[in-house]
Each structure stands twice: as structure tokens, then as C-alpha cells.
Amino acid sequence: MQPLANRFILGSLLLVGVEFAIAQTTAPAAAGSGIKGKEIYDARCSACHSVDDNRVGPLHLGVLGRKAGGVKSYSYSEALSKSKVIWSRETLTAWLSNPEALIPGQRMGYAMDNAQDREDVVAYLATLKAIK
């Protein structure tokens, strides 16, 4: 009876180990850092975007809570202008991951591969509150 109990225990431990390994590889990124996000934004986003001014892409001041395509002074693609997306942490993260999947027909030709970088940039964007 003892060998059967040992096999059961070993099998259970193996299963727990496999589940732990899977959880580690599919775990979501940690909460974003606005400080790190600003560094990433300055390095990767500022060629096309600015906090205060439109460039190749629209300004980002007050982006959280704004309708996609909602900066009146910027000329958006038809797809983005007609979109019903409201920028939230979730939609911004999805956008940075794959803009075309979120809003087909948009014009942004950049995606951020690293999940933690996306979380950090979104944390930074969340700090850019428009003055009302």
C-alpha cells in the first residue's frame, strides 16, 4: 500500500509543478510603472507623439477616458474616427499590443511586443491628465 501512496503523492507534486510552470509563463505583466513608462515613451513613442502637440500621431494629454479619434485638431483615419473605443487602461494595452486587431483600418504602424513595457507606458499615459 505504501508504494501506491508514494506514487499518488509524487504524481500530485508533478502536476502541481507543471501547473506552476504554466502559470509562470502565462502570468500577466506586473502593474505598470509610470516612471519606467515615461522612459519608454520618450524612447519609442516621442518620434510620432507628444504629450501636448499633434505630430505624426495625436497628442496624448488626457488620453485616458477620451474617445479614440477624439482630438479635434488631429486628422484621424476614417476607421479611428468612426470607432466607438474609449481609451481605458485595457483598451490602451490592447492598442499597444496590436492596433490593427483593436481597430481595423487604423494607421499606426507600431506595436509593442513586451507586455511589461505596455503596462509601463499605459501607467505613464494615465498620469497625463488634461486640465479642465
Each predicted region: which residue ranges?
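N-terminal signal peptide c-region/cleavage motif recognized by signal peptidases
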Residues: G17-V18, T26
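Processing junctions and N-termini across compartments
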Residues: G17, E39-D42
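Electrostatic cytochrome c docking/interface patches
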Residues: A23-I40, K132
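The canonical Cys-X-X-Cys-His
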Residues: Y41-V51, V121
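Bacterial N-terminal signal peptides that target proteins for export
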Residues: M1-S12
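Short secondary-structure junction motifs
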Residues: C45, R55-G57, I103-G105
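Gly/Gly-Pro-rich "capping" loops immediately C-terminal to redox-active cysteine motifs
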Residues: G34-K38, S50, N54-R89
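C-terminal capping alpha-helices of c-type cytochrome domains
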Residues: S88-K132
